[in-house]
Structures are given as C-alpha cells and as structure tokens.
C-alpha cells in the first residue's frame, strides 16, 4: 500500500517486485518458512493481493508435505475494536481451507514455540500484554534458542504506543540473561547488537526510499542447526540513487530514486515539474522529492515509511506532568 513517491503504475510494479522477491526467498527453502509479522503493510490491502499471496504460498506448500509455513502476527495485522477481518487473517483462512491446512501454523495469541529452537511472541493488543509474554520468556531457559519478536527495540518514541510495541533495555537484558538470542521484525533498517545476540533483521527488500537511506544491504535470516545467519537479499548498488533535480538522466535499472539539490523560490515550480515528469517516464518503483527550496525542505519521502516517522506524543507529554492519581483519571477518560 505504499503511495509516497509513486504513480498507480509504479505502485503495481512495486507490489509485483515485493511479491516476486518473497517467492524467490521461500523457493530456496524445503522445510520451514517463518514470516515474522506484517506480511502486508496495512490492516487491509487489495483482496487481489491477498489472493496472489495465497497462491504463492500454496505453490510452495504443494511441492512436498514436509514443508511448513509459520506466520507470526505483526502490528499491521491487528486493530483494536476492529469489526472487519484483516487481510492477514483473510490469508490465513484461505490457506486453512486448502488441502495444505496442516502445513500452516499461525502465531497470533501468545508466547509459543514455532519450530526447532525457534519461539516467538507475536504482536499483542497492548504493551502490558506484551510485557507479560516477555516476562514469561525471561523465566524460561533460552539457551540455544531464538525468540522472534515483532516490536521496536529500545525506542522511547514507541513507549506509550500500543500500536507499535517496544522492548526496552531492561527487558532485553533479562531475556539475554535467560540465554535467548533475540530476532526482531517490525523495524525496516537492519542491525546487529549485543555481540550478535540481538538481531534486527530489517525488511528483506525496500518498499520506500527511506528504507534505502543508510541501509545499503538488505537481508533475511536463516536459522540452521540452532545458529542464525543473515543472508544477503538486496543491495543499494545499482538499485538506489540520489540525483540532482537539474540532472535527471537516470538509467532505468535504478528502482528507488531520491531527487536532491537546492532551488530558489522562483524555481520551485520547475522542481515539481521535473520530478513529476521523471515519475511519468522512468521505470523506478519510488521517486521522492528531497529538494530544498531556499532552506525549506519540500521532501515528501517521510510519508513513504510511516514506521520511521518520529511524532510528538501529546498524551505521553501530558501524562509526564501529572501525578499518578491524575494520570488514572485521564486514562479513564480516554478508554
């Protein structure tokens, strides 16, 4: 459902590219595939996309009955007080109605074993329930085991958000003491911390320009013999480019383009026209405008990846100024 920096045609091409990338990844596996949350990037997507994704998984499952698909729920797969079915659960039902239903396992309720040495905590309805599951895992013997999580890692911007959960440093330390290796979904930019025992995989393929900035290589994670190893899936080289708005002769093999540079106020219309013309003529999936107009950034690229936007939490700021009793009153009004 990415729309920032796209046209209807490039949106369709972007969806095909992401789906084809997923199919290439799972076709390399003959036993277990795990999706660690947010297979889709919103609660509901075009039903045709759900159908295409179901067909993709069914083709893979049909090759041999030894294959198993484990799907973990992410934050986009759940909506509090939702009165309609998510695309995630629609996909799950479609797979359950197939002849391969016994090869599909859904993890959307609590801490549980996925397969082999792998366990998971799916996205939970709120931070308190998530904390309960984390505490359960911290009491277990996690030595030689991997715990999949779909949440932010130590992100204070997410501390008061139930939509996007957070694992803080104290919780991380408790899980590491228990012996776990932690594997995070949710965050788009990958990194490895704590001597390789905290692995933030990132997305295996970028879906926006934001995903390309500062993250020149993308990965998936293979867990074999109880040992997690990152495997390269995508490189910014020959795929992502930053180009000055005055020189937009860009080869077609670049699929993510960030238009940069500076312009005067009088040139602002020319900038918009140049970017629009490029979007209409180039085969790139996403083209964003990061040109600065007399010191003012006209960039719309932040809209391309909502997970990376750091918004000011008004409620959290107010709560921090109140006593505990006053906070309880406010919470009661908000419920």
Segments the model singles out, each with a brief description of its role:
Residues 216-335:
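Accessory, non-catalytic peripheral segments of nucleic-acid enzymes
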């Amino acid at each position: 459902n990415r729309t920032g920096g796209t046209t209807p045609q490039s949106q369709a091409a972007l969806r095909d590219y992401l789906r084809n990338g997923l199919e290439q990844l799972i076709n390399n596996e003959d036993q277990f595939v795990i999706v660690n949350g947010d297979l889709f990037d919103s609660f509901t997507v075009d039903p045709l996309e759900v159908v295409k994704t179901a067909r993709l998984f069914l083709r893979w499952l049909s090759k041999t009955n030894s294959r198993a698909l484990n799907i973990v729920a992410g934050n986009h797969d759940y909506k509090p007080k939702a009165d309609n079915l998510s695309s995630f659960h629609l996909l799950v039902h479609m797979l359950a109605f197939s002849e391969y239903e016994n090869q599909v396992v859904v993890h959307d309720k609590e801490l549980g074993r996925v397969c082999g040495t792998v366990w998971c905590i799916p996205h939970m309805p709120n931070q308190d329930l998530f904390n309960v599951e984390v505490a359960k895992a911290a009491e277990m013997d996690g030595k030689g085991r991997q715990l999949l999580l779909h949440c932010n890692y130590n992100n204070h911007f997410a501390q008061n958000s139930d939509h996007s959960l957070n694992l803080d440093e104290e919780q991380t330390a408790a899980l590491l003491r228990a012996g776990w290796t932690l594997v995070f979904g949710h965050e788009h930019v990958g990194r490895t911390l704590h001597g390789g025992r905290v692995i933030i995989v990132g997305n295996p393929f970028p879906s926006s320009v934001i995903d390309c900035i500062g993250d020149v290589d993308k990965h998936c994670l293979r867990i074999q013999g109880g040992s997690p190893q990152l495997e390269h899936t995508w490189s910014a080289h020959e795929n992502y480019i930053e180009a000055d708005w005055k020189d937009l002769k860009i080869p077609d093999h670049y699929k993510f383009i960030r238009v940069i540079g500076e312009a005067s106020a009088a040139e602002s219309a020319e900038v918009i026209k140049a970017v629009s013309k490029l979007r209409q003529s180039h085969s790139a999936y996403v083209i964003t405008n990061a040109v600065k107009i007399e010191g003012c950034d006209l960039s719309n690229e932040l809209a391309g990846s909502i997970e990376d936007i750091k918004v000011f939490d008004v409620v959290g700021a107010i709560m921090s100024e109140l006593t505990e009793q006053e906070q309880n009153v406010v919470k009661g009004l908000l419920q």
